[in-house]
């Protein structure tokens, strides 16, 4: 066994381990959504960003992109096609998130998708069209740091083992 063979083997394995995560989410506004919903949404965003960082993954969050003017649709479609893991915050059943989920269903294996949902007074359940998908109901954003994180770790483990 030559060192180059070991390096090539490592590179081949590393190439198949998920690194890129796309986050589909709504963009809250205290003025439009109210202070409480805004606070909850910001807490969810902060929690998922923390989890992704802890797992050394690259997050695509179009809401925080700082590259100047760009066509959000082109970037969104490209980044969804290129992501290794697709995460969607279904809370609020926002139209933009549902479009992103629909596009991802065509381009990302469902075994590499993860959804979570926090009910509110305005939106008490996941829309019918996506209710059959595997999603994590959460009461508080802290559950993203526990339950959702474990689900992401499971996806990473399955990818390392070549199962997905």
PLM segments and residue spans:
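TIR-domain catalytic/interaction hotspot
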Residues: 64-89, 93-100, 106
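Conserved N-terminal substructure of TIR/SEFIR domains
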Residues: 1-68, 77-80
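Extended, non-globular alpha-helical segments
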Residues: 44-81, 127-164
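Cross-kingdom TIR/SEFIR domain
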Residues: 92-155
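Residue-level preference for short coil/turn positions at secondary-structure junctions
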Residues: 17-19, 81-82, 109, 131
């Amino acid at each position: 066994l030559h060192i180059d063979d070991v390096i090539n083997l490592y590179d081949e394995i590393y190439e198949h381990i998920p690194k890129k995560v796309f986050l589909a989410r709504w963009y809250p506004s205290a003025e439009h959504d109210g202070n409480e919903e805004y606070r909850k949404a910001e807490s969810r965003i902060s929690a998922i960003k923390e989890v992704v960082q802890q797992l050394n993954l690259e997050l695509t969050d179009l809401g925080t992109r700082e590259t100047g003017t760009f066509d959000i649709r082109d970037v969104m479609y490209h980044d969804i096609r290129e992501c290794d893991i697709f995460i969607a915050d279904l809370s609020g059943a926002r139209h933009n998130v549902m479009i992103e989920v629909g596009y991802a269903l065509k381009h990302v294996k469902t075994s590499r998708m993860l959804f979570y949902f926090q009910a509110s007074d305005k939106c008490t359940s996941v829309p019918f069209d996506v209710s059959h998908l595997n999603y994590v109901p959460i009461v508080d954003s802290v559950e993203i740091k526990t339950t959702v994180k474990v689900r992401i770790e499971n996806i990473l483990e399955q990818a390392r083992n070549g199962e997905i």
